[in-house]
Swiss-Prot record:
Its EC number is 2.4.2.1, 3.5.4.4, 2.4.2.28. Purine nucleoside enzyme that catalyzes the phosphorolysis of adenosine and inosine nucleosides, yielding D-ribose 1-phosphate and the respective free bases, adenine and hypoxanthine. Also catalyzes the phosphorolysis of S-methyl-5'-thioadenosine into adenine and S-methyl-5-thio-alpha-D-ribose 1-phosphate. Also has adenosine deaminase activity. This is Purine nucleoside phosphorylase RP494. It holds the Pfam family Cu-oxidase_4. Belongs to the purine nucleoside phosphorylase YfiH/LACC1 family. The keyword Isomerase does not apply.
Length: 240
């Protein structure tokens, strides 16, 4: 468990080195046993000695859930915020960028799943705005492990989508050895969006999910190796 705000906010990146979980947290297909999922979720909750945990049904959106309000058990969204103590907020990832946020007074926390679609459609500014509306000041962020630029090849359509939003996004792409393809720096793009939203205090975990198979699940690596993909990194944060 890592300290984000002294004596109030704590977080952890639950990767493959955490042995008390099979790293499956939502039933995406029938090959995953519900009892296994519940045991994994309970293991994370117990790790923090927390009262409750929020798992999201992530859909690559820019939607943020206010967990202070009554919500469904597994809401369809890609981020959440809360002022509640002992409620663990989580996001799942396996190449996309997990972002953890806290007000420096330790009273408000948030999490966001920043894939390329959510990132280009303002999930970062959405969550920062919602936290500020609840009274957050001087936000601190953690950018979790994600796919690195050297591992993330994209096509020309993807490249043009980003440039159509802002020509300056060109800086996050370099040419691939493959014609009409590029290598994209998603973590750097997410960091820019945090900076543009006023978040300057950022801890960046710069480990590449794609090239660390013993530590991190990677959807793209699984696809390239033609092996089943059903594990996730769980990034979690809590107010104590």
């Amino acid at each position: 468990m890592e300290v984000l705000i002294h004596k109030s906010v704590y977080y952890k990146i639950f990767d493959k080195t955490f042995n008390n979980s099979s790293h499956r947290y939502i039933q995406e297909n029938h090959s995953i046993n519900e009892a296994e999922i519940l045991a994994n979720i309970e293991s994370i909750t117990n790790y923090f000695k927390a009262q409750d945990i929020l798992i999201l049904n992530q859909v690559h959106s820019n939607q943020i859930v206010n967990a202070d309000e009554h919500i469904v058990t597994i809401p369809e969204a890609d981020g959440s915020i809360t002022t509640k103590k002992n409620l663990v907020l989580t996001v799942q990832s396996a190449d996309c960028v997990p972002v953890l946020l806290a007000s420096d007074d330790g009273k408000i926390i948030g999490v966001a799943h920043a894939g390329w679609q959510g990132s280009i459609n303002n999930i970062i500014s959405n969550i920062v705005t919602k936290m500020i509306e609840k009274g957050a000041k001087n936000l601190i962020a953690v950018i979790g492990p994600a796919i690195a630029q050297s591992s993330y090849e994209v096509d020309d359509k993807y490249y043009k989508t980003f440039l159509s939003k802002d020509i300056n996004n060109k800086r996050f792409f370099i040419n691939s050895i493959k014609e009409n393809h590029y290598m994209f720096d998603l973590p750097a793009f997410v960091e820019l969006k945090l900076n543009e939203s006023g978040v300057k205090d950022i801890k960046n975990i710069t480990e590449d999910t794609y090239t660390n198979p013993s530590k991190y699940p990677s959807k793209r690596r699984s696809y390239h190796m033609q092996v089943p993909y059903n594990e996730k990194i769980l990034s979690a944060i809590v107010i104590k």
